[in-house]
Curated annotation (Swiss-Prot):
Effect of disrupting the coding gene: Reduced rosette size, delayed senescence, and reduced starch accumulation in chloroplasts of sepals.
Cellular component GO terms, alphabetical: chloroplast outer membrane
Gene behind this protein: P36
Protein name: Outer envelope protein 36, chloroplastic
Family the entry assigns: Belongs to the OEP80 (TC 1.B.33.2) family.
Protein keywords: Chloroplast, Membrane, Plastid, Plastid outer membrane
Length: 321
């Protein structure tokens, strides 16, 4: 099977590193959000094994070349001030940059990915059970290609008690080896932790998200509680080599030796730089309506900071788990 060019808009965050003075890094950094255009060329083969009554399995191998374009602005201001009759130099570098998402520091990465996916699904009048496991292995055909192991699982269970239908779901995953920032597990938003924006809870090398719902067939309503965490792994999300090189260039321009301050800049951890908590929970209620398009979903959620969000969606209870 041939997989063509894919283009998508993914929610990411841009930030302004702020002012760097000659003695270190100031604490007044501002941030803003936007979109990053990420394109991926993928060529590969899929092999689907014969499915049993409840289990199915798919194995695939793909050559992938994700890439994007980096836009940046770099300028330096130097100011002379007089103190005790002598001029002293101070300055700042404003570095307005869309942080590179790629591991290589170039406009694209290259990787060969072997993927194994297994699914179990069972649905009866009394309830439903669902489990899926994905394992991806990056194969270093060439020395500078990415090598990693990434797995993700989703387990769901629902049991019917008269008109009530409680449903619980647990999602988790982790990645070891080479990693690009766009491979981080995103936590927050519809389908994850409701009450937060997309990726507003955090992004890390690992994640664990729990969702619980109690639906009532008579009222077509549901109450829910979501919680998610990056398991403290956001600090392990790397910064691109291009970003590292340019931050070192800033240090050279400023001619200071505050290695600790520079280390804080290049340590990665985009969640910390953007004030993401790394853990969050949300709760609320929703309504479900059947329509020719599917199940219409309306959820009203509040998070740990008492912020409220209204979600709309079209989903199917059996497939969304």
């Amino acid at each position: 099977m041939f997989h063509g060019i894919k283009g998508c808009m993914i929610p990411m965050y841009w930030w302004l590193l702020g002012d760097l003075d000659l003695n270190g890094v100031r604490n007044s950094a501002s941030s803003y959000s936007g979109g990053v255009n990420l394109s991926k060329l993928a060529v590969g083969l899929d092999l689907s094994e014969p499915a049993s009554s409840k289990w199915s399995s798919t194995t695939s191998v793909k050559f992938e070349v994700p890439g994007h374009y980096l836009l940046q602005t770099l300028y330096m201001c130097v100011r002379l001030t007089m103190t005790d009759g002598r001029y002293q130099r101070s300055g700042r570098i404003s570095y307005n940059m869309q942080n590179s998402l790629l591991c290589s520091g170039n406009t694209h990465d290259s990787m060969v990915v072997l993927k194994q996916e297994s699914r179990f699904a069972k649905a009866t009048d009394q309830g439903l059970s669902h489990f899926s496991m994905q394992i991806e292995q990056g194969i270093p055909v060439v020395s500078n290609w990415l090598i990693f192991n990434r797995f993700k699982f989703v387990a769901s269970k629902g049991v019917r008690f008269g008109p009530a239908f409680p449903l619980a779901s647990l999602t988790g995953g982790s990645i070891v080896g080479d990693m690009t920032p766009y491979q981080a597990f995103a936590i927050g938003g519809l389908g994850s932790v409701r009450g937060y924006g997309e990726v507003a809870v955090g992004s890390g090398r690992s994640c664990l998200v729990a969702n619980t719902e109690l639906a009532n067939k008579m009222t077509e309503g549901t109450i829910f509680l979501d919680c998610g965490t990056d398991l403290g792994s956001s600090r392990l999300v790397p910064v691109s080599s291009l970003y590292l090189l340019r931050t070192r260039t800033i240090k050279k321009l400023l001619r200071h030796e505050n290695d600790k301050a520079v280390a804080e800049l290049v340590s990665g951890n985009p969640s910390l730089r953007q004030g993401k908590p790394g853990f969050g929970y949300g709760f609320g209620y929703g309504l479900r309506f059947k329509s020719p398009l599917g199940h219409l979903q309306v959820d009203y959620a509040m998070n740990a900071f008492n912020q409220k969000t209204l979600y709309f969606g079209i989903t199917n209870l059996a497939s969304s788990t």
